[in-house]
Amino acid sequence: MRLILLGPPGAGKGTQAQRLVHHYGIIQLSTGDMLRAAVAAGTPVGLKAKDIMASGGLVPDDVVIGIISDRLEQADAKDGFILDGFPRTVPQAEALDILLQSKNLALDAVIELRVDESALLQRVENRVAETTARGEQVRADDNPEVLSQRLASYRALTEPLIRYYSERGRLLTVDGMMAIDDVTRDIRRVLRRSGVPMSKFGVRRW
């Protein structure tokens, strides 16, 4: 089972990714973690990334793809994975498809957690009001203005990506505004219905 999970800030991607990992016996591949591991290990692409970051530059897509390629060769990735933080753009999605094809692999599904942005913002505003009323310090990430900017950025980047995967028949959409357990159940339901192959280890309870 090879998956991508898409969703805006506040949609609960982290929670659902961990539940997928546990339930299906696959691994979560975070581009940030893979990048740091490659740099620490001193791999060729890791050293290239290190030089770029040391000069203050952004790591280009081809280097990230190289790091993902190396990671997919490791034994624990053979039975499936969920990609976290990549792709974010259509060119990255195209590069990922080419990489997977070169390894005789393919994505099984791209799960989009669809949310009501105004409801997300209202949740944050309510949380800020409740925290302030208790005389407690508001968390740095509980900032409606910052969240609004992040949502706009996500929407601009991701809408073309969602179209890309929808046109290729890989997109599965789940209502991310439901309770956490209901979202989890719906993800499993759409995966079963779409015929996505399960991990060879089967499924587990959470």
Curated annotation (Swiss-Prot):
Q: Name the chain's protein.
A: Adenylate kinase
Q: Which UniProt keywords apply?
A: ATP-binding, Cytoplasm, Kinase, Nucleotide biosynthesis, Nucleotide-binding, Transferase
Q: Quaternary structure? A: Monomer.
Q: What is its EC number?
A: 2.7.4.3
Query: Quick one: where's region NMP?
Result: 30-59
Lineage at the top is:
Bacteria, Pseudomonadati, Pseudomonadota, Alphaproteobacteria, Hyphomicrobiales
Which GO biological process entries does UniProt record here?
A: AMP salvage
Q: Does the keyword Kinase apply?
A: yes
Quote one Gene Ontology molecular function term. adenylate kinase activity
